[in-house]
């Protein structure tokens, strides 16, 4: 009688397990087969930092004030700029950020007085070496910018 009870309990356990398996099998797939499928991003996604292009000027408005550099808790931002005209405002010439150490806290975006920093929607930043994460945002901005005729 003891063996029959064990067989029935084992059979019931098998039926219960198959019920759970089939129930999960009929649900829609949640896993995204990245990189074969494109990942749908949330509107609240905060990627890495990039320079924003303004429609009125067609360029960024970074004045190389260094506020973002001073406010960065990770100390990964280096900004350099020059004055285009003797009595004019400074214009950023280099905006280098080390994304391998950046915590993406967003303090630089919030503290920018001209609002020229924004979060990117790009999420594929893999590289072959550590130095691939050190990026000059000015070069990336110029590469993204449409060339005028």
From Swiss-Prot:
<feature type="binding site">
    <location>
        <position position="62"/>
    </location>
    <ligand>
        <name>[4Fe-4S] cluster 1</name>
    </ligand>
</feature>
<feature type="binding site">
    <location>
        <position position="102"/>
    </location>
    <ligand>
        <name>[4Fe-4S] cluster 2</name>
    </ligand>
</feature>
<comment type="function">
    <text>NDH-1 shuttles electrons from NADH, via FMN and iron-sulfur (Fe-S) centers, to quinones in the respiratory chain. The immediate electron acceptor for the enzyme in this species is believed to be ubiquinone. Couples the redox reaction to proton translocation (for every two electrons transferred, four hydrogen ions are translocated across the cytoplasmic membrane), and thus conserves the redox energy in a proton gradient.</text>
</comment>
<feature type="binding site">
    <location>
        <position position="112"/>
    </location>
    <ligand>
        <name>[4Fe-4S] cluster 1</name>
    </ligand>
</feature>
<feature type="domain" description="4Fe-4S ferredoxin-type 2">
    <location>
        <begin position="93"/>
        <end position="122"/>
    </location>
</feature>
<keyword id="KW-1003">Cell membrane</keyword>
<feature type="domain" description="4Fe-4S ferredoxin-type 1">
    <location>
        <begin position="51"/>
        <end position="82"/>
    </location>
</feature>
<feature type="binding site">
    <location>
        <position position="68"/>
    </location>
    <ligand>
        <name>[4Fe-4S] cluster 1</name>
    </ligand>
</feature>
<keyword id="KW-0830">Ubiquinone</keyword>
<keyword id="KW-0997">Cell inner membrane</keyword>
<dbReference type="GO" id="GO:0051539">
    <property type="term" value="F:4 iron, 4 sulfur cluster binding"/>
</dbReference>
<feature type="binding site">
    <location>
        <position position="105"/>
    </location>
    <ligand>
        <name>[4Fe-4S] cluster 2</name>
    </ligand>
</feature>
<keyword id="KW-0677">Repeat</keyword>
<protein>
    <recommendedName>
        <fullName>NADH-quinone oxidoreductase subunit I 1</fullName>
        <ecNumber>7.1.1.-</ecNumber>
    </recommendedName>
</protein>
<dbReference type="InterPro" id="IPR017896">
    <property type="entry name" value="4Fe4S_Fe-S-bd"/>
</dbReference>
<keyword id="KW-0479">Metal-binding</keyword>
<dbReference type="GO" id="GO:0005506">
    <property type="term" value="F:iron ion binding"/>
</dbReference>
<feature type="binding site">
    <location>
        <position position="108"/>
    </location>
    <ligand>
        <name>[4Fe-4S] cluster 2</name>
    </ligand>
</feature>
<dbReference type="InterPro" id="IPR010226">
    <property type="entry name" value="NADH_quinone_OxRdtase_chainI"/>
</dbReference>
<dbReference type="InterPro" id="IPR017900">
    <property type="entry name" value="4Fe4S_Fe_S_CS"/>
</dbReference>
<keyword id="KW-0472">Membrane</keyword>
<keyword id="KW-0408">Iron</keyword>
<keyword id="KW-0411">Iron-sulfur</keyword>
<keyword id="KW-0874">Quinone</keyword>
<dbReference type="Pfam" id="PF12838">
    <property type="entry name" value="Fer4_7"/>
</dbReference>
<dbReference type="GO" id="GO:0005886">
    <property type="term" value="C:plasma membrane"/>
</dbReference>
<comment type="similarity">
    <text>Belongs to the complex I 23 kDa subunit family.</text>
</comment>
<keyword id="KW-1278">Translocase</keyword>
<dbReference type="GO" id="GO:0048038">
    <property type="term" value="F:quinone binding"/>
</dbReference>
<keyword id="KW-0004">4Fe-4S</keyword>
<feature type="binding site">
    <location>
        <position position="65"/>
    </location>
    <ligand>
        <name>[4Fe-4S] cluster 1</name>
    </ligand>
</feature>
<dbReference type="GO" id="GO:0050136">
    <property type="term" value="F:NADH:ubiquinone reductase (non-electrogenic) activity"/>
</dbReference>
<feature type="binding site">
    <location>
        <position position="72"/>
    </location>
    <ligand>
        <name>[4Fe-4S] cluster 2</name>
    </ligand>
</feature>
<keyword id="KW-0520">NAD</keyword>
<comment type="subunit">
    <text>NDH-1 is composed of 14 different subunits. Subunits NuoA, H, J, K, L, M, N constitute the membrane sector of the complex.</text>
</comment>
